[in-house]
Amino acid sequence: MTKYKVGMVSLGCDKNRVDSEIILGKMSNEYEITNNAKEADVIIVNTCGFIESAKQESIDTILEMAEYKNNYKCKLLIATGCLIQRYGDELKNLIPEIDIMLGVNDYNKIDKVIKEFIEGNKEASKLLNYSDENINEGNRILTTQKESAYIRIAEGCNNFCTYCIIPKIRGKFRSRRMENIISEATDLASQGVKELILIAQDTTQYGSDIYGKKNLHVLLKELSKIEGIKWIRVLYCYPEAIYDELIEEIAVNEKVVKYLDIPIQHISDHVLKLMGRKTSKKDITDKIEKLRKSIPNIIIRTTFIVGFPQETQEDFEEILEFLQEYKLDKVGVFKYSREEDTPASKMDGQIDEAIKKEREEKLMLSQEKISNDINKLKVNKKYDILIEEYDGEFYKGRNFEMAPDIDGNVFFESPKNLEIGEFVKVKIIKNMDYDLIGVVEDESCK
């Protein structure tokens, strides 16, 4: 019997990407995986439901894939992910073309449900699980470049920021067992992965629930023992949860890149309190100063939300002043999105969209100049570059200061053919606002 072909459309964040890879891994034994949705008998849309624009993209994608049932080979349309977890009861009536719905903790059942559906059990067609006890784990089919892989170390969140719906969708914070993470990382290394990117809603809380204390520093130490792994990168570190042993491990561990993604979200105490953040401006600046003192070459990335309810012009300008003083290396800016069922959505003082957009643009322009000034200092320096692409003329890669997709890239030429997924020494000869231009200094990294 010919195997059904399965296609996946994965939307949203890198945590969603890991879910998609686990789903594909689970499907690969019984089904053929295809990257061409037009060839797929089964199409899975893994949705995002975090902010309004993501919800709309998810709905548009589901409707687009529903057309494939009429125009191409698709016989079965499955919708999964955060949008389904959040609005599944409504969507099963609004979009009847969806044959199967799965909540964010149901992925371990997907092969069984598909088999039952194909065999005629339509009772399995609308399955939602609102339990927050499960953690999706299993063999993955990577959808990233072969040299880098995200590895989720925990699921859920206990922070309950007033603007965020994630705890209601993903449930309470739950760490994975360390031995399971090590096993997965070892398997990824055997596939040629050189860079592990640790993710969770709050990576700094890793271990606090199952080991009785924060254990991210221990996990980093154990991961660094895996042969073949050269870089270990940590994203989503809440500033108030960064602790001394973690700082020390990052400082001394050669495989842990000196880079931290720390979602500050705001710097005004007034807005931080409204956001339900468990920190203050002084705590944040003290933590940045401590990190820079302990790890002199550390790269700090952060994100800000502008246009939060009751954010004054003075609150906004406080972010600008903070960035001018502390000159963070990487900054992302988001306009506040009013999400139903969150405390912030019910607050007085909602900000006009035009003001949000103006503040977003002003903040990004300010950071653009800061980034350019920082990048100027990199000219004539040499870096180990992880090669990711070649377009026939230029190679593209990243140094340790750059996370995939969210930061810049290094572009360079080489007189010799280089292997994608390998490291090469590159001298920077020119900077741009976010990217760097270089030349190969030595075809082997020392």
UniProtKB/Swiss-Prot annotation:
Key words, A-Z: 4Fe-4S, Cytoplasm, Iron, Iron-sulfur, Metal-binding, S-adenosyl-L-methionine, Transferase
Domain (TRAM): give its ranges. Answer: 376-442
* List of residues binding [4Fe-4S] cluster 1: 13, 48, 82
Q: Which GO terms describe its biological process?
A: tRNA modification
UniProt KW Transferase keyword: yes
What does the note accompanying the cofactor annotation read? Binds 2 [4Fe-4S] clusters. One cluster is coordinated with 3 cysteines and an exchangeable S-adenosyl-L-methionine.
Q: Which Gene3D superfamilies match?
A: Methylthiotransferase, N-terminal domain, Nucleic acid-binding proteins, tm_1862 like domain
GO cellular component terms, semicolon-separated: cytosol
Residues forming the MTTase N-terminal domain are 4-119
List GO molecular-function terms, semicolon-separated.
Answer: 4 iron, 4 sulfur cluster binding; aspartic acid methylthiotransferase activity; metal ion binding; protein methylthiotransferase activity
Q: Which residues form the Radical SAM core domain?
A: 143-373
Q: List positions binding [4Fe-4S] cluster 2.
A: 157, 161, 164
Q: Which reaction does it catalyse?
A: L-aspartate(89)-[ribosomal protein uS12]-hydrogen + (sulfur carrier)-SH + AH2 + 2 S-adenosyl-L-methionine = 3-methylsulfanyl-L-aspartate(89)-[ribosomal protein uS12]-hydrogen + (sulfur carrier)-H + 5'-deoxyadenosine + L-methionine + A + S-adenosyl-L-homocysteine + 2 H(+)
PANTHER family tied to this protein: RIBOSOMAL PROTEIN S12 METHYLTHIOTRANSFERASE RIMO, RIBOSOMAL PROTEIN US12 METHYLTHIOTRANSFERASE RIMO
The protein's job, in short, is: Catalyzes the methylthiolation of an aspartic acid residue of ribosomal protein uS12.
Q: What family does the database annotate?
A: Belongs to the methylthiotransferase family. RimO subfamily.
Name recorded for this polypeptide:
Ribosomal protein uS12 methylthiotransferase RimO
Instruction: Supply the source organism for this entry.
Output: Clostridium botulinum (strain Eklund 17B / Type B)
